[in-house]
Amino acid sequence: MLKINYKLRIFVMLVVTWLITALGVTAQVIQEQGDPTLAAPLEPLRSGVTEEHVFAEMASHNELRSAALLDYTAFRTYQVVDLKGKVHAEESGRMEYRAPDKKTFVVTSEKGSGLIRHLALNPLIASEIEAASGKQHHDSSITPANYSLHLVGEQQVGLYHCFVAQAVPKRVDKYLFEGKIWIDIQDFAIVRIAGHPAKKLSFWIERADFVREYQKIDEFWLPRRDETFVQVRLYGKKILAIDHQDYTVNGMSNRVVLQTSAGSF
């Protein structure tokens, strides 16, 4: 029995890693109604805003930001936890990006299960580095080629006032998702993504939900918090959390821009 459980644990960690690296965005277990960043009510959409306009503005703003982003460094903490909050494994370190396609990660501390770090955390980090270099390419960008958007209103998300849209994938693909996106009305940047994979990933994955949250640092929008919630058949529920902190962008130390709710539209 111990041997079977050991093999199942290994298999589960591999499946969780597959989920995270396949989807490219990650998840958190809290429901929207319990999320303090979504305490504000959904407001009616202002007149004159169309899905086509939002897509066009997102593309142009993203192109400008990508061209201006030369480098960044961030301190990251990866954790695998259970629903009681017990940390089963943790890995912390410094992620460095250099335009156009180089990422490196330097580990500064490790805690908990070495097996989980080896089977889940290390492959996750390696996959991100390979994706940045172009060794793994899957077009999962939020563009008209991959998604239809249906604007449903506006909402304050923490510091940022956003358009809210349902994102509907145009094909059944494990690299795409179905859910909601929150788009900053001034910068046309993604503030929050929440949903689930467009394609069932495995017989073993009974449920998979995700959220990614971003923050504005200077003129750029970079990840703030990820969590992945996965319910695995015969094994239960696990959460992988990633915190992104202490950014240095283009040689400048972390300065989170406080944004008012006034729109530019």
Q: How would you name each of these model-derived features?
A:
Residues 1-8:
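N-terminal secretory signal peptides that target proteins for export/translocation
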Residues 7, 13, 51-53:
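Intrinsically disordered, low-complexity proline-rich regions
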Residues 9-13, 247-250:
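Short N-terminal leader segment in a subset of presequences, especially plant chloroplast
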Residues 11-22:
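Bacterial N-terminal signal peptides
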Residues 28-178, 185-189, 198-208, 215-216, ...:
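Structured extracytoplasmic
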Residues 193, 224-226:
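Beta-strand-dense domains in secreted/periplasmic systems and polymorphic toxin scaffolds
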